[in-house]
Each structure stands twice: as C-alpha cells, then as structure tokens.
Amino acid sequence: MYNILIIGAGQLGSRHLQGALLSKNELNITVVDPSQESINVACERASEVKYGNPHSTVSYKIDIPNNEYIDICIIATAAHVRAIVTKQLLLTNEVKQIVFEKVLFQKLAEYDEVVQLLNDSKSVGWVNCPRRLCSTYIALKQRLDQSKPIHMMVRGGAWGMACNSIHFLDIFSYLVGHSSLELRESK
C-alpha cells in the first residue's frame, strides 16, 4: 500500500484525487484542506470515479498530519502559501516525493528555502509540467533543426495565462534544450 497525501482539495487537488483513485495500486489517500467547501468538492469528485483498486481508502482532514511516512505528496495549494505548507510538511513528516503545482512560489527566496528543505529531508521534488513526457513532443524534439532559431506561437482562449503559459514555456525550453528564453508579446 502506498501513502498518498494531497494538500489542497480545490480545483486542482480534487482532480489529482480523481486521478489517484483510478490507480490499480492500493492507496491510502489523505486529502488536507482547511476549507470545508474544498473538502466537499473533493468528496463529490471522488464519488464521480470508479476506484481502480477497491481496497484504496480516502480520508479528509483540515490539518497536515504529523509523524507520518508519505510516499507521494501533491501540493496543490495557492502559490502564496505553498512554501509555508512545504516547510510544515517536511519538518514533521518523512516524505519520499513531492509533486508541486505551478507557479511554485510568489517570492524568489522561497525557491532556495524549499530546495534546502528538500535536500535536508532527502525528499525529491517535481513540478507538475508533464508535457515533456508526451511521445509527440519527444518525436518533435528529435526532428527539430536546432542550427536555426526556433519560433513558437501558441493560440487559444478561455485558459488562465499564468497557469497554462508555464506549460508552453516549459515545453519550448525542453524542445530547444535551453532554459534561457526570450519572450515577445503579440496582439
């Protein structure tokens, strides 16, 4: 059995819960959120999926647990509290891996603080930007002629700029093999 902790039960956290419940693995899932409204959203969304393993369990709490072993923690809180939540989690629990939603933090100093916390606790952190793993992007990267400048344009509507732009920036960074990018606005 794997111990899964999801911190933040709102829109993203409840979707992570649905995905976890589809797993064939036996999971002990704990969902934490101080908002009863968010807990209610998570409960409702959990009831919409058929468990991939009938032995998996879900519990809901308002506080981060203490003195627990956690295989995977998904931190899907608002960015302005994410570093505080991470510190509270890692100072009182043993966590093997953490998946962070993006944008990670609101202050530059919090990046260094969390990296140090991850190192000190021997936890591995991941940022939820999975497009690099898609076979289409892997094949595209192999076909790109990187001897010339590469331009990318993204069009769309009804999606949050900050939430979704990071995915396109990340995939472009992956495709060109650089993390230093120049952005231009188009109207």
Residue ranges and their predicted role:
Residues 150-187:
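Rossmann-like dinucleotide-binding domain that binds NAD(P)(H)
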Residues 1-51:
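N-terminal Rossmann-like dinucleotide-binding module
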Residues 14, 18-22, 44, 87, ...:
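Short, well-ordered alpha-helices that flank and scaffold nucleotide-derived cofactor binding pockets
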Residues 2, 27, 96, 123, ...:
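Nucleotide donor/acceptor-binding cores
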Residues 134-152:
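Rossmann-like NAD(P)H-binding beta-loop-alpha module
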Residues 54-69:
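Short acidic low-complexity segments
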Residues 67, 71-132:
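Beta-strand-loop-alpha-helix segment that lines the small-molecule cofactor/substrate pocket
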